[in-house]
């Protein structure tokens, strides 16, 4: 079985962390796969905890999906270290990390949608 981790930074604002958990739940419902949220800091579970849950559920392959817009320090330095640590603990599990969100055509569509909403809202206010 392939399991997925939606990996986010984490926030002191719990509603922001809950929003990530909600996205993971929505992904699981739409994709019919097990999707666990995980946080670099300021949220639970961390990556190791999410991996443990997926392995316990029978995952032999884990795909980590960064919920980050761009490839910054956390994705270049911190995430590879955390994945390596989990791979050392779970040697029988295959790990893969996807690219961040930047460059995906759907992101441009989401941003344009927000811009259209703002313009429409401004026109309605006149």
Annotate each language-model stretch with its function:
Residues 1-126:
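Active-site-proximal alpha-helix that buttresses catalytic centers in soluble enzyme cores
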């Amino acid at each position: 079985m392939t399991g997925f981790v939606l990996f986010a930074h984490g926030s002191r604002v719990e509603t922001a962390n809950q929003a990530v958990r909600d996205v993971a739940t929505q992904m699981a419902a739409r994709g019919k796969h097990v999707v666990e949220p995980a946080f670099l800091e300021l949220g639970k579970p961390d990556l190791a905890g999410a991996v443990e849950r997926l392995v316990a559920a029978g995952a032999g392959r884990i795909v980590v999906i960064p919920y980050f817009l761009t490839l910054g320090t956390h994705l270049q330095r911190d995430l590879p270290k955390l994945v390596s640590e989990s791979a050392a603990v779970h040697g029988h599990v295959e790990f893969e990390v996807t690219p961040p969100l930047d460059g995906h055509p759907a992101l441009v569509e989401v941003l344009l949608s927000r811009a259209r909403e703002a313009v429409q809202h401004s026109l309605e206010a006149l």
